[in-house]
């Protein structure tokens, strides 16, 4: 089912519909992630008298969690590409490609905009083969370092370079990410445009100030709570967070640590906490949908990732006037300024523990930092700014009909 926004009845209603630009937006899967939130917001906004959006999504993995409810809350019913998933499978990917081609042939969109790697590959290829006039891809991160073997990485880079040649524009979400794309020669600089993420901050503000989550989890209200928020996967490096907590607990006991989220490493993390003997200072509440509950009970948010695009948990924390401590990876240094609106530190337990202890000991004196962080994030990462940037891009880019191999 495809949800289309109903306009006011008038004699010109048919003409208005004909003037609409149709977007097919494609994401690899609506798993628990900031990208799923981003895509849901865009699909909602670009459904009005001027735009029509169709959202296509693959299927989340077994331990990734499912956020398909989110676009539905905005009145968007995604079309599921049942063979498109996280893992590489020649047969499933081929079947997914066939389904994508059929949908694009039927819908004849003006624009295809893809998000995340698998959707970027299959979706753009289908758009190229069916002659879609405008093709965009947003990099929410990349897998060019630290993910795969050198041979496999080189292969994926070649695919991205090929697809970029047929893309109208490549979208980076930060200055540092654009620099990476240029460094790996994915596309020429003038083909890459920077559009930072934007968020519906009403989902987390004003946050709950009655410590409901702490009460539910039996966490002392006088303790400083430090959280890692997001999918519990290898790229998020949750073990580093746990080892850092262990170092902190050797020197301070007025703290409590949480890992908020689910993933394939959750059980391993629980085992590590038990092995270190710090289970009394650790809680695993799993995925929590209500952001106001989270940020009403968390004081410090850590990010220990190996790589990132623009991590949503940090932006949400900063908007909620929480202290953030992060490793300087991906696009993080583009918005976390060390000592000004948050803290950056090396990816080792001692360095992170030292920074946590500093923040715990000086918690009351860091109000200036929290307020500065909120002001910057709320102004730069608003969803209205995001919508305006994308509308300008879509409208200012000339449509160019590509070769069409599959339409009649």
Task: Pin down the residues of each PLM region.
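Aromatic "clamp/platform" in nucleotide-sugar-dependent glycosyltransferases that forms part
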Residues: 287, 306
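A conserved mid-protein helix/loop that constitutes part of the nucleotide-sugar donor-binding site
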Residues: 36-41, 224, 228-247, 264-271
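Nucleotide-activated donor-binding/catalytic signature segment of Leloir-type glycosyltransferases, i.e.
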Residues: 270-286
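Conserved acidic donor-binding segment of nucleotide-sugar-dependent glycosyltransferases
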Residues: 338-339, 343-350, 358-364
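A short, active-site helix/loop in glycosyltransferases that binds the activated sugar's phosphate group
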Residues: 166-191, 199-203
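N-terminal strand-loop element at the rim of the active site
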Residues: 20-21, 25-33, 37-92, 177-180
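Short hydrophobic beta-strand element within catalytic cores of glycosyltransferases
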Residues: 323-326, 336
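A short, well-ordered alpha-helix in the C-terminal region of glycosyltransferases
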Residues: 358, 365-380, 389-392
